Amino acid sequence: MKAFFNPVNRENLDFFFPKTENRIGNNIQIYEKDFPNLEGVKIAIIGVEEERNAADNLGCGQAPDAIRKQFYRLFAQNNMPAIADLGNIKIGKTANDTYFALSEVAAQLIERGIVIIILGGSQDLTYANYLAYQQLGRTINITGIDQKFDIGDEHADIKSDSYINKIILSNPNVLFNYSNVGYQSYLVDTEEIKLMEKLLFDAHRIGIVKRDLVECEPVIRGADLVSVDMNAVRFSYAPGCNNVGPNGFSGEEICTLTNYAGANDRLSSFGIYEYNPQLDIMNQSAMLISQMLWYFIQGVSLRNNDLPDIAKGNFYKYFVSILDTYQIVFYQSKTSHLWWMEIPINENNKEKISRNYIIPCSEKDYLTACNEEIPERWMQTYKKLIP
């Protein structure tokens, strides 16, 4: 694996953080001369300086080290999981070569049960991240925190604003569901909205999400891979992005969403993309990203394998009948109080899609069912599972 990486520059490293204090940079393994020992590592940080397929955002390839300068300065958390910064992926002769390197590294780390953090770079790197799961033969859910869907034209070359189509059309296809959190209607073609509906993908508009952020927690809890486009954050909080606008998530909101991602027992990949240091003002965007990482890591530290398993006796199980037509089974954790619901499927298919027939939900979904209404989240998944 070492052959895929360039070490973190030692000269810059001395500037990153004070050496005498309890900073994150003093409490993690960093690839300087010797490649980190991955035994016992919970989180691996991967920088990728690839920007050749960025959509009007050249300069975002400089992001990884700019983020490190701010991230390493933050104070370490109590009970912080073991972290290794593996350095930056060596840029290939072509962008596809970089995709290959990233997918190979990601596949090896995921197979070892190590959560990966990708510091882009342009967001088309999400496609390379997806290829790692394809290589492993794992069906996954992807959640994109983004102001757009990034679907693009099926005949167009891959770009950071058109990579989802490449994932949808990949063969073999291991994508079960794609969810968007934070799209802005005036930036999205109505035809793309119709396509999302046709494909039974989830789309959550920025205004609805901001009104009740907690309702998007189950969306993120159901993801294996979360990809964050920094253009989803409004300009006043993250000016260092070429396509950012006046509306979007606040700093507090995006940190909450990344904390949800970290706490998700299912999630194995997390990436932050499209930050451009050349456009940043007083390192404000880099500081916000470093805090997003801090909250993500805090979420990982709080994981406790909180998944429905009635045999262990750690969940309540509720049966809700709706108009004598449907019976929906809900699960509530006795420790976290989070909710899940079960989708009835053919017993022969349960093993194939076992990670998807019990899906995360909210208490609001349970209360909706108690009022004899079918939760939209339940129906959406039911349509995907029952042809």
Question: At which residue positions do the language-model features occur?
Answer:
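Conserved alpha-helical scaffold segments that buttress catalytic/binding sites
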Residues: 2-45, 51-272, 276-387
